[in-house]
């Protein structure tokens, strides 16, 4: 016996596809840099859903470039190895022992899990870090924090070659120093720097929040750089949202057309943001 979905389901699907058509044209051959992080990384189904979305984006002509984090996995491995961390103003000091673990976890464990998830869904992904082909060269972000880097040079040639070959780059936020040191880079910061170097059409920061909120706690769906600066000065944007919006503003000033902060835990968040009228988070434009 064979059954069919209700007619209302067919109509809803048709409407969704119809709505997506102009956006599919809009993003054909566009480069979209996506920072994958938050709790979605630790959930197998969320990881698989993300991978399917990325593969679909590639199949319809979008060029996704993935940058990932991995803080919880790093914490777990440091605890397992009984390596204690010092903190300065709430930020981890990354000493010589810690940076080895950070690189091992980000490049060797987290990166390959994401690559494998994408390839399992039919995509072609390749994993690399900011060290490969001198992709990201760093200076120390703060000497007191040890091997934590701030990108000063991004060479995107290798990424462009991969994108032209319809391969999905997956990048671990590890950079190299001017003297050959290894640096850990904040994932959002790395994604923003790479997006600017690629002159990406979009930078998507997947987080554990639904977007930038106003003074009443409601998500603001569209903002300008000036709005961000005003809300930050007024204390409306505060705490952990400040570095995320700063990353977006810096990327936009560096040549990215727009940046979006959205909830990576929501199903199909990237697809909803790119291919629907409503979007899925807070989009920031130059103004």
Curated annotation (Swiss-Prot):
MF annotations from Gene Ontology: acetylglutamate kinase activity; ATP binding
GO cellular component, one term: cytoplasm
Taxonomic superkingdom: Bacteria
Localisation: Cytoplasm
Entry keyword Nucleotide-binding: yes
UniProt pathway: Amino-acid biosynthesis; L-arginine biosynthesis; N(2)-acetyl-L-ornithine from L-glutamate: step 2/4
Gene Ontology biological process: arginine biosynthetic process via ornithine; L-arginine biosynthetic process
EC number in record: 2.7.2.8
Residues at which substrate binds: 70-71, 92, 184
CDD domains (UniProt xref): AAK_NAGK-C
Keyword Cytoplasm among record annotations: yes
Catalyzed reaction equations: N-acetyl-L-glutamate + ATP = N-acetyl-L-glutamyl 5-phosphate + ADP
Keywords: Amino-acid biosynthesis, Arginine biosynthesis, ATP-binding, Cytoplasm, Kinase, Nucleotide-binding, Transferase
Family assignment from sequence similarity: Belongs to the acetylglutamate kinase family. ArgB subfamily.
Annotated NCBIfam families: argB
Function: Catalyzes the ATP-dependent phosphorylation of N-acetyl-L-glutamate.
Protein name (Swiss-Prot/TrEMBL): Acetylglutamate kinase
Taxonomic source organism: Dinoroseobacter shibae (strain DSM 16493 / NCIMB 14021 / DFL 12)
Recorded name of the encoding gene: argB
């Amino acid at each position: 016996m064979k059954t069919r979905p209700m007619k209302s389901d067919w109509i809803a699907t048709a409407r969704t596809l119809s709505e997506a058509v102009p956006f599919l044209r809009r993003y054909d051959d566009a480069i979209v840099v996506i920072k994958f992080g938050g709790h979605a990384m630790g959930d197998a189904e969320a990881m698989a859903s993300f991978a399917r979305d990325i593969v679909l984006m590639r199949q319809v002509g979008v060029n996704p470039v993935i940058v990932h984090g991995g803080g919880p996995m790093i914490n777990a491995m440091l605890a397992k190895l009984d390596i204690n961390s010092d903190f300065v103003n709430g930020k981890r000091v990354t000493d010589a022992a810690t940076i080895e673990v950070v690189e091992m976890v980000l490049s060797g464990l987290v990166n390959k899990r994401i690559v494998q998830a994408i390839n399992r869904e039919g995509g072609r992904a390749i994993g690399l870090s900011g060290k490969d082909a001198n992709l990201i060269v760093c200076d120390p972000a703060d000497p007191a924090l040890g091997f934590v880097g701030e990108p000063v040079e991004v060479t995107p040639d290798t990424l462009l070659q991969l994108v032209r070959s319809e391969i999905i780059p997956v990048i671990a936020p590890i950079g190299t120093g001017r003297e050959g040191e290894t640096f850990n880079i904040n994932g959002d910061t790395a994604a923003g720097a790479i997006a600017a170097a690629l002159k990406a059409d979009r930078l998507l920061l997947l987080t554990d929040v639904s977007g930038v909120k106003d003074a009443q706690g409601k998500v603001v769906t569209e903002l300008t750089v000036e709005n961000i600066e005003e809300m930050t000065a007024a204390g409306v944007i505060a705490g952990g949202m400040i570095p995320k919006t700063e990353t977006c503003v810096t990327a936009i000033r560096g040549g990215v057309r727009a940046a979006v902060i959205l909830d990576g835990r929501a199903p199909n968040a990237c697809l909803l943001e790119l291919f629907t009228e409503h979007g899925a988070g807070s989009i920031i434009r130059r103004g």
